[in-house]
Regions:
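A conserved, positively charged/aromatic
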Residues: 137-168, 174, 181-182
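A short, well-ordered alpha-helix in the C-terminal region of glycosyltransferases
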Residues: 223, 354, 361, 368-384, ...
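N-terminal strand-loop element at the rim of the active site
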Residues: 20, 28-31, 35-94, 262
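Short His-centered aromatic/hydrophobic patch
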Residues: 117-123, 141
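A conserved nucleotide-sugar
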Residues: 60-62, 215-224, 237, 241-284, ...
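Conserved acidic donor-binding segment of nucleotide-sugar-dependent glycosyltransferases
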Residues: 340-341, 345-353, 361-367
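Short hydrophobic beta-strand element within catalytic cores of glycosyltransferases
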Residues: 65, 325-328, 338
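A conserved mid-protein helix/loop that constitutes part of the nucleotide-sugar donor-binding site
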Residues: 43-54, 223-246, 268, 353
């Protein structure tokens, strides 16, 4: 598989945090960057928005977020960003006019320079308002684009009607350029990043580990295979059980972290499948946990067996940052973040037997090989997939667009 042989970890790079040039923004002050997303709930898009708000402020800009609100509002405002609660999650076009006027009023009030949309409904609502004010527009495409129907193609395509488009992986970029023309020259890939300070094995204390173990009642003497994922079929819970059924001779307990929060039809199907495969007592469904670094810390192997390609997949990054062996199928964004047999394994897509072989290899690693992989994984993430790198590259996109506009207005 090409992704197994072509991956390179590269040399260590030193990223100096970029700063905005004040003269490139309107009024000679630090630029005002307005990010717009549906809600501030727990998720990768939302975390990335807060991380970017922090980076904008650190670069000398003003960070503003428009969303429908959510449990992360306090975390956002605590970093110094300004939040405006507007229902930009609304998908009913009949309501967009009123919401658009609200957004336009905020953009004028905040004296915005750049509008950065992170989802489709907000793009339909906010981009016309931004363009009517002559503002720079940016979008980040976080998800797969489904373009089979004509209407869906038009709906998704709104995300590409900006001055610059950011794709979170080469995989997402390929989906965009395969379906839409005239985008590539204003399209760049900025991989999602992981907070290497939060996901640092050296900083996870023993009390945190004990609390985690007690909360989900984990044994101490059995290797743990962990799948942290939403209770959704495409995340690969069933194919992981099939893979584990082929290596029953090895000691392990599989923990489906977050799966217990699914509907009864989902959890019943997983339990029934496991019992049918002879894995009764060898797997456990638990609720999601807040302390993911501690959860990763107790895992011996982290698996991300998504049967549909992930646009990117933060779980793989977080596991590698924690120095944990990670296994995923060799497709989608996972193929870009995992270096096969150096920081983890890439199994043949949707092949339960090959997935099982990879898990067995991880479980049977010698202490020395595990130590080498732990170091390589951590270095790989620090060099190529840190939050600091993601934010720096995005700030540079903003700065280029501001400079280009300033030059055009001279």
């Amino acid at each position: 598989m090409s992704s197994k042989t072509n991956q390179k970890s590269g040399g260590k790079t030193s990223l100096s945090p970029p700063k905005f040039v004040k003269k490139h923004s309107r009024g000679g002050h630090g630029p005002v960057i307005v990010q717009i997303l549906p809600r501030l709930v727990r998720g990768g898009v939302e975390r990335g928005t807060i991380e970017m708000a922090e980076a904008i402020i650190a670069a000398g800009g003003k960070a503003v977020v428009i969303s429908g609100g959510g449990i992360l509002e306090h975390q956002l405002t605590r970093c110094g960003a300004i939040h405006h609660r507007i229902p930009v999650y609304e998908k009913n076009p009949l309501k967009w006019g009123l919401i658009r006027r609200q957004v336009r009023a905020v953009l004028r009030q905040e004296n915005a320079d750049i509008v950065h949309v992170r989802s489709r409904a907000p793009a339909w609502i906010a981009l016309p308002a931004a363009k009517s004010l002559g503002l720079i527009t940016v979008s980040t495409v976080h998800a797969r684009f489904h373009t089979k129907s004509f209407l869906k193609r038009i709906y998704n395509g709104k995300m590409l009607k900006t001055d610059h488009v950011i794709a979170i992986s080469e995989y997402v970029k390929s989906l965009i350029t395969r379906s839409y023309f005239g985008v590539e020259e204003r399209l760049s890939v900025i991989h999602r990043g992981v907070d290497v300070k939060a996901f640092d094995a050296n900083d996870v204390t023993q009390p945190r580990i004990i609390r985690l173990v007690e909360r989900i009642d984990l044994p101490e003497d059995v290797p743990l295979v962990m799948l942290p994922a939403r209770p959704t079929s495409w995340k690969g819970h069933e194919i992981l059980l099939e893979a584990l059924a082929g290596i029953k001779h090895l000691p392990f307990l599989c923990v489906f972290l977050g799966a217990a929060e699914g509907r009864a039809s989902f959890t019943d199907r997983i339990v029934q499948k496991g019992v049918e495969l002879g894995l009764e007592g060898r797997f456990r469904l638990t609720e999601a946990v807040e302390d993911m670094p501690a959860a990763m810390m107790v895992a011996d192997v982290v698996v991300m067996p998504s049967i549909t390609p992930e646009p990117f997949g933060r779980v793989a990054l977080e596991a590698q940052a924690m120095g944990r062996p990670v296994i995923a199928f060799d497709h989608g964004g996972a193929a870009e973040s995992i270096v096969h047999e150096k920081t983890g394994w890439l199994a043949k897509p949707n092949d339960a037997d090959d997935l099982g072989r990879c898990i067995a290899a991880a479980l049977e690693m010698s202490d020395n090989k595990r130590r080498l992989m732990r170091k390589a994984s951590r270095n790989h993430i620090e060099q190529s997939f840190s939050t600091a790198k993601m934010c720096s590259e995005t700030i540079r996109v903003y700065a280029r667009l501001l400079a280009k506009k300033a030059a055009a207005e001279r």
